[in-house]
Amino acid sequence: MSFSEFYQRSINEPEQFWAEQARRIDWQTPFTQTLDHSNPPFARWFCEGRTNLCHNAIDRWLEKQPEALALIAVSSETEEERTFTFRQLHDEVNAVASMLRSLGVQRGDRVLVYMPMIAEAHITLLACARIGAIHSVVFGGFASHSVAARIDDAKPVLIVSADAGARGGKIIPYKKLLDDAISQAQHQPRHVLLVDRGLAKMARVSGRDVDFASLRHQHIGARVPVAWLESNETSCILYTSGTTGKPKGVQRDVGGYAVALATSMDTIFGGKAGGVFFCASDIGWVVGHSYIVYAPLLAGMATIVYEGLPTWPDCGVWWKIVEKYQVSRMFSAPTAIRVLKKFPTAEIRKHDLSSLEVLYLAGEPLDEPTASWVSNTLDVPVSDNYWQTESGWPIMAIARGLDDRPTRLGSPGVPMYGYNVQLLNEVTGEPCGVNEKGMLVVEGPLPPGCIQTIWGDDDRFVETYWSLFSRPVYATFDWGIRDADGYHFILGRTDDVINVAGHRLGTREIEESISSHPGVAEVAVVGVKDALKGQVAVAFVIPKESDSLEDRDVAHSQEKAIMALVDSQIGNFGRPAHVWFVSQLPKTRSGKMLRRTIQAICEGRDPGDLTTIDDPASLDQIRQAMEE
């Protein structure tokens, strides 16, 4: 079957299509109804079927490949490496599941996980899935008030954390941040389970705090039966990044999530049992939830949990892992690759990367220069894909297991099965034609694996995502265009649009032009208020060579060259009013550019919540660059 036929069946016959895909996982009780869409926009998949994510990730592989690698935990910060076979991982997950039950955790209870990227974090999530507890991971290093807001929203009976993590040689004091958060929160967990890594001193609260290692010792060898959950019970809550006010918890189911991930591993990522999948993300983000914690194990692959930066202690650290563990598929973000662009390619190429078959990139738009550079450097195809926290798995990609169409630089590909993607005119709501820019939306029902609702707030779910147009369609809040061959191109968020004297430009368009300059390593473009034009674009550039930072004449020359390049590629209406050179740009710890923060600084406004920022010194660079 061609991909086109596969896709059309998913849109025209969704119930039959997804019933067939559901055979990819084990069901303890068969479902009686594939889809219940009687209360749109809410969709219920595989109704009355009973299954379990942990069983499908671990237990069902025990007979086929018990001694195959399942989990590889690597920390470039502590220089530790730990490996677990499926049998060993099964033992560890059972022990932790027994620990959770001893602390009073029951089916449907929330367990908040605030941990570094260590094996215990992954094992804890699988243990929650095993007993039917709902896990909610808060990205490590979030400031206390952000953690407190999530505690109050999720109301966990237990929090699992650690003394500290590390990033680029810097210690991140998880326990201290957590204690501050709990003191600010109205809801109080019954217990806090703590992994002591010996990285930082931590005060313990008597009667509340429990040592992970000591409790584990009491539960070694325990066997905890799987809780068979109805498909639409909640598996996890994941809070979207960058929210203000009340946190927005994306609620996901059990059966739909398992089926969607299992299908994607075969059709999109080409994962095969016995292989090794390296997703260089964090379990606190959706990519890590889906393609570190669950999807590789569902496919019988080993999954790598990595603590550290792509450049620490050197720029070869990822590639050493690829070589050592014979990684066949790797998943990262464009930002990480742009960082690596600043280093000599010889440092990467000196490693044996012959096992690596493809590199997947997602999380933000992938510019063509970065895609070309990494593909040539690694000598592997690069496959972009586009999705969101809410979708849980790719909305657009090239389904490499089904589709032989080539990748097209700058495009994440075509809509994936189950996603009836449309581009709509923002004013009229009418469908856009070829090469016409519109908002990317998805016709309901959303396919399995996507957001069920916002935790505890159905009204907000409908109002936020389904009320933008006159008819109910799911709004992604991303601009896109579609070419004559059906490839889509993401132009940035709908709030990342610059209106310069009536010309509407996506920041992505200008950034892509500037990125094509040979002296540019990375760039961020924002729109700032202008008395004459309404808005003008300004660019902050990380140069490949430091002379643009040290010599004003060189910087001025480079600025003129970049402006001329934008003139030639977009037109002078897209030319930045200023190009400033910096050595780093403000980003979250997950690598996302903080464009709104940059914009606020440029306009002299309060930059607001900075809890997700990786290095606050980058903000000083923005301010200093503008003053010079």
Where are these regions (language model features)?
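AMP-binding/adenylate-forming catalytic domain of the ANL superfamily
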Residues: 190, 194-196, 535, 568-593, ...
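Conserved AMP-binding/adenylation subdomain of ANL enzymes
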Residues: 258-276, 286-329, 342-345
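Gly/Ser/Thr-rich phosphate-binding loop
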Residues: 298-301, 328-332, 341-407, 420, ...
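Conserved ANL (AMP-binding/adenylate-forming) active-site segment centered on the GW(Y/F)…HTG consensus within
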Residues: 379, 448-477, 494-495, 507, ...
